[in-house]
From Swiss-Prot:
SMART domains: SecA_DEAD, SecA_PP_bind. It comes from Clostridium tetani (strain Massachusetts / E88). SUPFAM superfamilies: Helical scaffold and wing domains of SecA, P-loop containing nucleoside triphosphate hydrolases, Pre-protein crosslinking domain of SecA. The gene is secA. PROSITE patterns: SECA, SECA_MOTOR_DEAD. This is Protein translocase subunit SecA.
Length: 836
């Protein structure tokens, strides 16, 4: 502990001193609240809403509101938030992260700030990591809010559109991070505002906040459509990758999770794909397929990174061990893995809309979170999200004994020792939870235990349907549970009396994770609410963490000691070496996430501009003036780009200008070079704008004014969506190659910002051009089938009534004040228009 922390206390301790007086005030109201009838307690909600409408703030009513919610919780679910939970609730209301250990009742804590903030009527989202927890929390805690007169909804994966709208319109809405994010993206793809489901993003309480905002931070949410590229090349690239020899043709950088061809490998690629120079930019597509095939075959591990079930490649979450349904690796990696595994290769998709969790959750007016482990990532929460972490004291002291790590030379020796430890613990009846890092490792231990005759249950991605049930049994007398990482997080492991006598739940970690936080989560499964327990991690020098990031000094000591497979060492120096390796990885991952957000901020600002303008269009703003402005901008831009100051080329330039404008809005041969050759650039612009305005006025006469406004809106939205999708792809391609700018002594992030901005300006211009083009071409179309039916009907009936109802297709009309198309230079009404 630093010297000033010894004198002044930690940051959390100092913050708690400010909160405790508020908790004391809530405590003092306890007796008053108990005396209220149910009706009087319920009426408090309307009283608070009225006070807020008269100018009081949420902080003004916090003490009373918390006291009301506390009493309601006791009456409805027979749970009364204790002081530590009140502290947690206040920290959440303040828009911070409350670190609360496992079993401290985070679900109940969330009800306090949720009730208070819902009183404003702007909505509160309580975010969990899966549908099961969202549904469970809504069912258990929803009754408290409903008792107090508030509405509660839950967003689940299979909800219909109107059910989603209903759930979001509730005062408090439970849902998963992915569903909330996807609904936001879908809302920004609709054509009618009535199709939107979400309201403004007001206040969010994120459960397991570290899992969502840090572990998932690099995972973009993507809504995609079917791509057009063939998948055959993935199979060709896979065949090539499988023919290569490690170290000779390619090298694997495990720290960077990268696989690279050697010079010899490049020669083989040139021979295999019949290329002159593999590095040529024209061979970029081949390079991309080869890189992904190499990564799929030599970096991605089956039953660790992914699993194959029913002929489908499924991603396994490295942090939770859960299958991530509906997710696919991007950039063709998923297709490369499908080719590797010999299953059906699906087409690469086209991204229609995308956002990262980092940027989605930063859009909330107020954001807060709860987790059992946040302190190790305190700097990241503060720097990226502006959230500080406050550690909430436990209700009862933690009695769990955390033993120091045991280090073995080989994996074989480590696993033998783990199994021996499980057997001995099982004999005493003490339950054991064994944490593994992959499906493969969990099945290895399971097999070893079977040979020893030890009954056990396995929880990994293959058995995820039974997750809650398996976890609920993990604390039973004599139970042995093998689980990948943090599967079962969010479900408490409760202990019976005889288990407490046997020493509580024992945690065995089979290797250290890259992040200390994940290790702490595993430990935190034991010792909840003052229960006894123990934890220990078993490590070998062959573990990925030690092999890739461990210090040579530690390896040297183990070699000098001449340890056998079944011999272990325990020392402070060993524990420090392991922690330093973890800090190294955490720092590396933090830097990656920081860089990612610098890149993502560029497209995020662009996304905000597009979605804001899109929203204004949806809200039914009259677009006529905006469309006229677009027409003027397009004409000005086209004239400026076509007409130079070179006299000799003027006529040729005018000819090209007219042809270009004929592709956008001018009817063919409507205007000739001689009509413009004696005018200045500004006069040309004005003349063309007047012509466009007249043509557009005639176009409006084909439709009713209201119908035309609707057409403008739909066309503009469709053009914006199409151009935005293409822009996302282009920005992605730019990002993939931007790292090479470092070789030119350019900052890749600055280069990405500059070029991304140019591409965005170009997209905005193209939106204007296409919108104008489509609006000038829009016609009342008649379908051929209908036309035939109409003819037959009119012949049979002999009347003209049906003819009036037929769709009418009109040709572009010449306005009376337009230039006559004969080329005379006179107005139409004074020339050929007279004859008409």
């Amino acid at each position: 502990m630093r010297i000033w922390e010894k004198i002044f206390g930690t940051y959390s301790q100092r913050e708690l001193k400010r909160v405790i007086p508020i908790v004391d005030k809530i405590d003092k109201l306890d007796q008053t609240m108990q005396k209220l009838t149910d009706e009087e307690l319920k009426n408090k909600t309307n009283e608070f809403k009225e006070r807020l409408s008269k100018g009081e703030t949420l902080d003004d009513i916090l003490v009373e509101a918390f006291a009301v919610a506390r009493e309601a919780a006791w009456r409805v679910v027979k749970l009364k938030p204790y002081r530590e939970q009140l502290i947690g609730g206040i920290i959440l209301h303040q828009g911070r992260i409350a670190e609360m250990k496992t079993g401290e009742g985070k679900t109940l804590v969330a009800t306090l700030p949720a009730y208070l903030n819902a009183l404003k009527g702007e909505g509160v989202h309580i975010v969990t990591v899966n549908d099961y927890l969202a549904k469970r929390d809504k069912e258990t805690m929803g009754a408290i809010y409903e008792f107090l007169g508030l509405t509660v909804g839950v967003i689940l994966h299979d909800l219909e559109h109107n059910e989603r709208q209903e759930a979001y319109n509730c005062d408090i809405t439970y849902g998963t991070n992915s569903e909330l994010g996807f609904d936001y993206l879908r809302d920004n793809m609709v054509v009618y505002k009535e199709e939107r489901v979400q309201r403004k993003l007001n206040f969010s309480i994120v459960d397991e906040v570290d899992s969502i905002l840090i572990d998932e931070a690099r995972t973009p949410l993507i809504i995609s459509g079917q791509g057009e590229k063939s998948t055959e090349f993935y199979k060709v690239a896979d065949y090539f990758a499988k023919s290569l020899i490690k170290e000779e043709d390619f090298t694997v950088d495990e720290k960077a999770s990268a696989v690279m061809l050697t010079d010899k490998g490049i020669e083989k690629a040139e021979a295999y794909f019949k290329l002159e120079n593999y590095a040529d930019p024209e061979n970029m597509e081949i390079q991309h397929h080869v890189v992904q095939a190499l990564k799929a075959n030599y970096s991605m591990k089956k039953d660790t990174d992914y699993m194959v079930r029913d002929g489908e490649v499924l991603i396994v979450d490295e942090f939770t061990g859960r299958v991530m349904d509906g997710r696919r690796y991007s950039d063709g990696l998923h297709q490369a893995i499908e080719a590797k595994e010999g299953v059906n290769v699906e087409r690469e998709s086209k991204t229609l809309a995308t956002i990262t969790y980092q940027n989605f959750f930063r859009m909330y007016d107020k954001l807060s979170g709860m987790t059992g482990t946040a302190q190790t990532e305190e700097v990241e929460f503060r720097e990226i999200y502006g959230l500080d972490v406050v550690v909430i004291p436990t209700h009862k002291p933690v009695l769990r004994i955390d033993n120091s790590d045991v280090v073995y030379k080989s994996e074989k020796g480590k696993y033998m020792a783990i199994v021996d430890e499980i057997v001995e613990t099982h004999k005493k009846g003490q339950p054991v939870l064994v944490g593994t890092v992959s499906i493969e490792k969990s099945e290895l231990i399971s097999e070893m235990l079977k040979r020893k005759g030890v009954p056990h249950q396995v929880l990994n991605a293959k058995y995820h349907e039974k997750e809650a049930e398996i976890v609920s049994h993990a604390g039973e007398y004599g139970m042995v549970t093998i689980a990948t990482n943090m599967a079962g997080r969010g479900t408490d492991i409760k202990l019976e009396e005889e288990v407490i006598k046997a020493g509580g739940l024992k945690i065995i970690g089979t290797e250290r994770h890259e992040s200390r936080r994940i290790d702490n989560q595993l430990r935190g499964r034991s010792g909840r609410q003052g229960d006894p327990g123990a934890s220990r991690f078993y490590v070998s020098l062959e573990d990925d963490l030690m092999r890739i990031f461990g210090s040579d000094k530690l390896k040297g000591i183990v070699e000098k000691l001449g340890l056998g497979d079944d011999e272990a060492i325990e020392s402070k120096m060993v524990s420090n070496a392991i922690e330093n390796a973890q800090k190294k990885v955490e720092g590396n991952n933090f830097d990656i996430r920081k860089t990612l957000i610098q890149y993502d901020d560029v497209i995020n600002k662009q996304r905000e501009i597009i979605y804001k303008q899109r929203s204004e269009v949806l809200e039914g703003a009259d677009l006529k003036d905006q469309i006229q402005e677009m027409i003027r901008d397009v004409i000005n831009s086209v004239v400026d780009s076509h007409i130079s100051d070179i006299e000799e080329e003027f006529k040729e330039e005018l000819d090209k200008l007219i042809k270009f404008l004929e592709d956008i809005f001018l009817p063919k041969d409507y205007i000739k070079v001689e009509h413009l050759e004696n005018l200045s650039n500004d006069e040309i612009k004005e003349k063309l704008y007047d012509i466009a305005k007249n043509i557009y006025t005639d176009k409006e006469e084909e439709f009713e004014s209201e119908q035309m406004r609707d057409i403008e809106r739909v066309i503009l939205l469709r053009v914006v969506d199409t151009k935005w999708m293409d822009h996302i792809d282009n920005m992605d391609h730019l990002k993939q190659g931007i790292g090479l700018r470092a070789y030119k002594q350019q900052d890749p992030v600055q280069a990405y910002q500059f070029e991304g901005s140019q591409m965005f300006d170009e997209m905005i211009y193209n939106i204007k051009v296409d919108t104008v083009r489509y609006l000038f071409r829009v016609q009342i179309e008649k379908a051929p089938e209908r036309e035939q039916v109409a003819k037959e009907t009119s012949t049979n009936q002999g009347g003209d009534d049906t003819l009036k109802k037929q769709p009418i297709k009109k040709e572009p009309k010449i306005g009376r004040n337009d230039l006559c198309p004969c080329g005379s230079g006179k107005k139409y009404k004074n020339c050929c228009g007279r004859e008409v």
